[in-house]
Amino acid sequence: AYKNALTRLPLDKKTLIEKDGGYQAGSYWRSVGGSVYDFYDYHYLGVNPNSGLPMYTVDEEDYSPADFDGVKGLEYGQMEDGTYWVSQTSYASRQKLGKSAIPEVYGGISTSLEAYGFDLSVQTAFQIGGYVYDSYYASLMGSGEYGQNWHKDIFKRWTPTNTTTSVPKVQNNTQNISEASDRWLITASYFSLRNITLGYTFPKKWMEKAKIRSLRLYVVGDNLALASARKGLDPRQSFSGSTGYNYSALCTVSGGISLGF
């Protein structure tokens, strides 16, 4: 298991420390006893079934209908549980999300077998727990610009005949439908098949007749498979839960002959 906790805060952050003894550092919240990578951002509540616009949490002290009235395209209200919401992140409130990029457990499993001249070795890696911010997926779910590619999940978007969905309606010239929020946080758990090697060593008595000391044929496969919470997502990009334009480990298959005289 992996444990991570802050034991003290830097002195130069004293002016930023709030009532609960922590401070914001980009998309993270730093506090004593918390993880170095606890996410801090907007909380996505879903889609307004009446309009198709997104809903983001706003703190009660920041909720001001008098200030909201007259703002173009802005919707606001209160959920049945008392939570206040707005449709634009410019008026929403960032908050501690209770999710960390730090995994609960990570490791690997490997094994090797030999029988009747055959040898097989397998190496795997895994992670359980933690969250990753899937920025690729977010960019494919509505950038607010023309000529952009879309993820197939956009077909689940709100329409007048599909009002029970978590995907807002499509809009141009707005980032609110894909703004940074916990909507794009997804579990970073994964299982990867890192290597499989299969070989066969010919019997010595066969090789003696050919005046060869040893002969082995083998096939090697690297990075053959990755299972994650969303197809195409590689949570291994960074330990901080961020994603970038990086290549995943390439899948390769090769073979060879080991010959000894």
Q: Which residues fall in each region the model found?
A:
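Conserved small-residue
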Residues: A1-K99
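Transmembrane beta-barrel strand/turn architecture of Gram-negative outer membrane proteins
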Residues: A1-H43, E104-G142, I196, Y200-F202, ...
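Extracytoplasmic gating/loop element in the C-terminal half of outer-membrane beta-barrel translocons
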Residues: Q127-D222
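Membrane-embedded beta-strand positions of outer-membrane beta-barrel proteins
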Residues: V122, L217-V219, I257
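C-terminal beta-signal and terminal closure region of outer-membrane beta-barrel proteins
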Residues: D20-L53, I154-F155, T159-T163, S178-A180, ...
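Outer-envelope beta-barrel architecture signal
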Residues: V105-G107, Y116-F118, S189, K211-L215, ...
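Short sequence motifs at beta-strands and strand-loop junctions characteristic
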Residues: K99-E104, R183-S192, Y247-C251
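Extracytoplasmic loops and strand-loop junctions of Gram-negative outer membrane beta-barrel proteins
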Residues: Q24, Q88-K96, Q148-H151, N176-W184, ...
